[in-house]
C-alpha cells in the first residue's frame, strides 16, 4: 500500500490502496496495520479541502489536524496519487 509520506501525521500513517484508486483522490489515516476497514478516510477536493467519509479511531483534534495537513500538502499528495491513478479530485459524487 503506497504511503503519502514516510512519517506519521497526528500519530497516523497517511496512505491509499492500489485497488481503491478507481475512486476520487482520498487519504486513509491509520495505524501500522494500514487496515482500511478501521482507518479514517478523507476525500480530497481540488482546493485541498476534505470531506471526512469515516473517522476511524481519530479523535476530533486529529481529524482537524490531518485535514489541515492535507490542505497544506494536497498538491504534493496528488502527485503521489497520480503515480497510481488517473482519477481526479473529489467532486461530491461518490457512491458509498
Predicted segment positions?
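Alpha-helical protein-protein interaction elements
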Residues: 7-8, 18, 34, 66, ...
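Residue-level detector of solvent-exposed, low-hydrophobicity positions
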Residues: 14, 22-26, 33, 49-50, ...
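A short, structured beta-strand/loop element
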Residues: 17-61
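Acidic, low-complexity intrinsically disordered segments
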Residues: 54-96
